[in-house]
C-alpha cells in the first residue's frame, strides 16, 4: 500500500488517478482549495484535504505533509487559464515552488510532476526529431497558451535544479481526451501531434509513481500500442529523458 498526496486533487486526471489507485488498495489525499469539491473526491474514495496553494506558505504545506508523511507527492495543480497570467504564475509556478520547499522541510523526497508535452525553451531550436508538422503545431500552441507554458517551464526547470533534494519524475502527456483508456501508450521522443486519454494518463502516472527506477527522468507520453507497464519498463531500461531542461 502506497500513500499519495495529490495537489490539484479535483482535476479530471487527479480524480481518475484516485479511483484507479484506491481500487488497487492505495490511499490518496486529494488537496483542493475548497471543501465544496469533497463530494466528487469521496465518490472515488479519496480523502479531501483543503489547502490553497495561493494562500498557504511552504511551512503550512510542510506541516500538512509531515502529518500524513506520504510515500509520493503528485503535483497536478494548475490555474487552468482562469484568473489571468497572475494566477497562472501563482499556481503553476509559485505553487509548485512552495511544494518543493515544503517537501524539503518535511523530509519527503518522491514527486511526480504532471507537466505537458512540448514544454520547452522556445528560444532554442526544436528537438531534432520534430517533424515540420510538429514545429508548426508547437508554434501555434505556444502562441495560444504561452503564459501557461512559460510558468510550467520555469516550475519544471526549478524542479530539475533541486535534484539533490527531490526524487522527481516529470511526466509530459500530449493533448488529452475523455475517451476510455486503452491501457496502451507510447513513451519517449514522440510526435506532439497526438492525443492521450486521461484514463491512460492516470494509469501511467500511477505506475511511474510506483517505479523508483524512473527517478530524474523526463517522459513525453501519448496513446500508443504498448501496454503501459511494458512501455515504462522499456523507457526505464533505456534511461533517456525525452527532454533536457537547461539549468
Curated annotation (Swiss-Prot):
GO terms for biological process: heme catabolic process. This is UPF0659 protein C216.03. InterPro entries: NAD(P)-bd_dom, NAD(P)-bd_dom_sf. Belongs to the UPF0659 family. Its main location: cytoplasm. Keywords: Cytoplasm, Nucleus. It comes from Schizosaccharomyces pombe (strain 972 / ATCC 24843) (Fission yeast). One of its GO terms (cellular component) is nucleus.
Amino acid at each position: 500500500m502506497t500513500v499519495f498526496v495529490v495537489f490539484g486533487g479535483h482535476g479530471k486526471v487527479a480524480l481518475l488517478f484516485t479511483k484507479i489507485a484506491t481500487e488497487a488498495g492505495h490511499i490518496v489525499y486529494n488537496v483542493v482549495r475548497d471543501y465544496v469539491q469533497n463530494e466528487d473526491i469521496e465518490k472515488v474514495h479519496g480523502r479531501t484535504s483543503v489547502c490553497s496553494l495561493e494562500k498557504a506558505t511552504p511551512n503550512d504545506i510542510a506541516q500538512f505533509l509531515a502529518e500524513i508523511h506520504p510515500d509520493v507527492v503528485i503535483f497536478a495543480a494548475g490555474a487552468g487559464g482562469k484568473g489571468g497570467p497572475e494566477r497562472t504564475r501563482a499556481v503553476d509556478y509559485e505553487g509548485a515552488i512552495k511544494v518543493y520547499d515544503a517537501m524539503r522541510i518535511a523530509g519527503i523526497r518522491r514527486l511526480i510532476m504532471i507537466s505537458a508535452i512540448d514544454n520547452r525553451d522556445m528560444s532554442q531550436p526544436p528537438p531534432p526529431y520534430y517533424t515540420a508538422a510538429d514545429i508548426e503545431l508547437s508554434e501555434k500552441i505556444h502562441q495560444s497558451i504561452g503564459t501557461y507554458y512559460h510558468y510550467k517551464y520555469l516550475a519544471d526547470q526549478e524542479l530539475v535544479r533541486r535534484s539533490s533534494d527531490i526524487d522527481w519524475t516529470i511526466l509530459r502527456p500530449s493533448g488529452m481526451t475523455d475517451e476510455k483508456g486503452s491501457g496502451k501508450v507510447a513513451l519517449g521522443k514522440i510526435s506532439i501531434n497526438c492525443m492521450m486519454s486521461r484514463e491512460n494518463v492516470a494509469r501511467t502516472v500511477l505506475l511511474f509513481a510506483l517505479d523508483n527506477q524512473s527517478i530524474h527522468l523526463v517522459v513525453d507520453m501519448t496513446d500508443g500500442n504498448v501496454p503501459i507497464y511494458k512501455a515504462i519498463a522499456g523507457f526505464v531500461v533505456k534511461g533517456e529523458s525525452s527532454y533536457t531542461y537547461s539549468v
